[in-house]
Amino acid sequence: MRIAILGGSFDPIHLGHLQIAKTALKKLAIDEVWFMPTFSTPLKQGQQASFADRCFMIKRAIYGYRRMKVCTLEQQLGGTSYTIDTVKRLKKQYPMHEFCWLIGMDQAIRFPDWKSSEELKQEIDFYVFSRGSEEIEVPNDFHKVAMELYDVSSQEIRQGKKLYMLPKSVRMYIGKKGLYI
């Protein structure tokens, strides 16, 4: 089975994340997309929701998509989440699967800052999702996937903007739990 990993803080998950997963399932030779929420990320500050809340929001957002799953491996690893460690554990824990990693333009640009980025490029294939008209500089050996991207970020949503870019079930959960207020 070929699995595409979509990693991120998903704080909260929004329609842009789902669009990447849907596009990957349509355009790439993959069987499933696994959403991999970071337990603790080294390159972002200001995380608002707990790991459990973020996982629950992902489950609500992907409900009904049988080829999308949540993978909580980074919680099992504990501590700061580094992609190199996650990839090595995935390969060890699921030796019969083949993995690739899905990232957006923002992460592709920051990729040289990732821990062991050169080794990581040897471990797994990366697919960068970008607007078809945008020319971005990405590391060698990365595959570009053009798509219609939504203009939204989780940070904007945490600030109370663009709430319409949340799946309804996630928006209801945020309201019920009083997250990001």
Question: How would you name each of these model-derived features?
Answer:
Residues 1-181:
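Nucleotidyltransferase catalytic core that binds NTPs
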